[in-house]
Each structure stands twice: as C-alpha cells, then as structure tokens.
C-alpha cells in the first residue's frame, strides 16, 4: 500500500456496516462516520441506531448524523475533517456536488449491481425479480447523478435459481468490502482510473414498497416465482384466502391450469395455484398470528382451509 488515507465513511444499513468492518482492518484512518439519524423501530417505536452507527461507536469513531448535507454548516464540518477520500455505501442522503468536491480524491460508492444495470435504490431485489443471470458490486467514483459515475472496479456473482433477495444481499455484502479495499489501494497509488458508464444500457431499480408485494395471479407463474424470491425477506409477497391475509415466503413452478388464483391441489408438497400462465406451488406460508411454516406443516393442521377450487386474492 502506497499510503494510509484519511477516510470519511458514510453508510447506514448492515450492508454498509460490512464495508466499514473491512476498512477498520486496513491501515487507513477512519476520521468520521456519517449515518442516518436514529429511526423509530419495533413495536414500541423506540429510536434505534443504524447498524453503521452501532459499529462505529463500538470502535470509538466520531459519528455524524446530519439531516442533510446541503447546508453550508454541514459542509464546513465535513471539510474540517481534511479527508483524502469519502467512502459511501447505502447512506440514504443525496450528496450535492459541493460535498463530492471536498475530499482530495473525491467520493467513491459501492453499489450492489453491475452498473449501468440497476442504478437506484433496490438493485439486489430487482435483479432477482427480473431473472438476471448474474449480479455483483460496482465501485464507482461518485457524481451528482444517481449512480452515474465512472466505474473503478466490478466483481460479479451468478444468481442461482434458489437465490432470494436475502441470500444475494449477503453474498454481495461479502464481495463489496473486498472490492472497496482494492479500489482504495489503486486510488492511493494513482493506478486506478474510472471507465465511463454507457447510459444507453442503464436500467433503474426503483425503491421497493409493500403495495407491489401483493401477488397478481393473472401474471405468469415464472414471474411470480421470481417475485417471491426477490421479496424475501422484505417486503414479503402476500395474497389472501377467504379474506384472511396469507404471506408467501417460498414457491416453485408447478404443472396445471385454471382461472388465475384458483387452488388446483393441496398436498404435503405445497399449495398449487393457477396463474395467468402455468401454475405456482406455494411451499412456505405464514398465516395471521403464526410464524412462517413449510406448507406440509400447515397442511397437517389446517387441511380443510385449503380446499381445491377456492380462489386466492379475492
């Protein structure tokens, strides 16, 4: 390594915390950690720190939690840190150009997709939902645009037919930190230079919301199967049966046809439901007041609730 850098880290969720852990194991000096303000969480809506804040406090690092970085006071506070580089991972605040210009080497970002595909807020889930063959992490030099900056380094991983949003997240959370450490070494040595993105190839990973997690049985089974995997563990796909909500946490493609949403078969292998094209076998469900269970367990105790001919989602 050519030199140890003064680094400001900015991030919020567990994905970002994994990157901070990796940086703490390098000779670089973390001079401050920026993270989102504490948010209410849980049934009691108690204010809870982010994963990044908790880790930073464990290591005695200064923590900054501004509501915005657009005002002159916050920017002056950042400039006073005399950082060589700012590393940004799932921070959640927009960085104006004035902030991007403060560190000597600028700001770099670890983004959970193979840019320019899946710029935006939910790249992991959108890649699974779309049936992409691979995903990865791109380390880029940040610009004022949304995930538009020059690409410094890419690492890829195949997306398997069993991958969920959660499993792909965890794999990328292991790949990303190594890529960031490698990119920082190249920047410090002056040997790493960015490659411009092809905007014509860009796609956008819009933020997830609970409303889109409702299963639309008129869609093809192959699309719904990917949606179930993509939205596990959040926001979790759901439907209804006899006016009661039903969460769907596991599914596989099945054989059969009928009016969309119709239960074609119930067995220990799963609940077979007709779709717009093909059929989907629901293998892991959660009923109101219960915990997630394999359908075989529900079938043993609630067989009468899943009678053939009933229609889901009405």
Swiss-Prot record:
<comment type="similarity">
    <text>Belongs to the Fmt family.</text>
</comment>
<dbReference type="InterPro" id="IPR036477">
    <property type="entry name" value="Formyl_transf_N_sf"/>
</dbReference>
<dbReference type="GO" id="GO:0004479">
    <property type="term" value="F:methionyl-tRNA formyltransferase activity"/>
</dbReference>
<protein>
    <recommendedName>
        <fullName>Methionyl-tRNA formyltransferase</fullName>
        <ecNumber>2.1.2.9</ecNumber>
    </recommendedName>
</protein>
<dbReference type="InterPro" id="IPR005794">
    <property type="entry name" value="Fmt"/>
</dbReference>
<keyword id="KW-0808">Transferase</keyword>
<dbReference type="InterPro" id="IPR041711">
    <property type="entry name" value="Met-tRNA-FMT_N"/>
</dbReference>
<dbReference type="InterPro" id="IPR011034">
    <property type="entry name" value="Formyl_transferase-like_C_sf"/>
</dbReference>
<feature type="binding site">
    <location>
        <begin position="113"/>
        <end position="116"/>
    </location>
    <ligand>
        <name>(6S)-5,6,7,8-tetrahydrofolate</name>
    </ligand>
</feature>
<comment type="function">
    <text>Attaches a formyl group to the free amino group of methionyl-tRNA(fMet). The formyl group appears to play a dual role in the initiator identity of N-formylmethionyl-tRNA by promoting its recognition by IF2 and preventing the misappropriation of this tRNA by the elongation apparatus.</text>
</comment>
<dbReference type="InterPro" id="IPR005793">
    <property type="entry name" value="Formyl_trans_C"/>
</dbReference>
<dbReference type="InterPro" id="IPR037022">
    <property type="entry name" value="Formyl_trans_C_sf"/>
</dbReference>
<dbReference type="InterPro" id="IPR001555">
    <property type="entry name" value="GART_AS"/>
</dbReference>
<dbReference type="Pfam" id="PF00551">
    <property type="entry name" value="Formyl_trans_N"/>
</dbReference>
<dbReference type="Pfam" id="PF02911">
    <property type="entry name" value="Formyl_trans_C"/>
</dbReference>
<dbReference type="GO" id="GO:0005829">
    <property type="term" value="C:cytosol"/>
</dbReference>
<dbReference type="InterPro" id="IPR002376">
    <property type="entry name" value="Formyl_transf_N"/>
</dbReference>
<dbReference type="InterPro" id="IPR044135">
    <property type="entry name" value="Met-tRNA-FMT_C"/>
</dbReference>
<keyword id="KW-0648">Protein biosynthesis</keyword>
């Amino acid at each position: 390594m050519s030199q140890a850098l003064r680094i400001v880290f900015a991030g919020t969720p567990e994905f970002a915390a994994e990157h901070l852990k990796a940086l703490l194991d390098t000779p670089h000096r973390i001079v401050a950690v920026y993270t989102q303000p504490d948010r209410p969480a849980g049934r009691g809506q108690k204010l809870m720190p982010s994963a990044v804040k908790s880790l930073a406090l464990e290591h005695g690092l200064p923590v900054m939690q501004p509501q915005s970085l657009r005002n002159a006071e916050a920017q002056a506070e950042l400039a006073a840190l005399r950082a060589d580089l700012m590393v940004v991972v799932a921070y959640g605040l927009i960085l104006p150009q004035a902030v991007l210009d403060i560190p000597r080497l600028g700001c770099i970002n670890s983004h959970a997709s193979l840019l320019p595909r899946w710029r935006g807020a939910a790249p992991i889930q959108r890649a699974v939902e779309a049936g992409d063959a691979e995903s990865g992490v791109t380390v880029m030099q940040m610009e004022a645009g949304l995930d538009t900056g020059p690409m410094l380094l890419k690492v890829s991983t195949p997306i398997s037919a069993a991958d969920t949003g959660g499993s792909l997240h965890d794999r990328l959370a292991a790949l990303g930190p190594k890529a960031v450490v490698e990119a920082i070494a190249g920047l410090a040595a002056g040997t790493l230079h960015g490659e411009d993105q092809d905007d014509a190839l860009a796609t956008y990973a819009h933020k997830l919301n609970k409303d889109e997690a409702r299963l639309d049985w008129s869609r093809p089974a192959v699309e719904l199967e990917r949606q179930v995997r993509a939205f596990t563990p959040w926001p979790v796909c759901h439907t209804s049966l006899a006016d009661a909500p039903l969460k769907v946490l596991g599914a596989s493609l099945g054989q059969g046809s009928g009016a969309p949403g119709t239960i074609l078969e119930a067995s220990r292998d799963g609940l077979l439901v007709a779709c717009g094209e093909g059929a989907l076998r629901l293998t892991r469900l959660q009923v109101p007041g219960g915990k997630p269970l394999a359908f075989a367990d529900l079938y043993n105790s609630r067989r009468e609730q899943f009678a053939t001919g009933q229609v889901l989602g009405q």
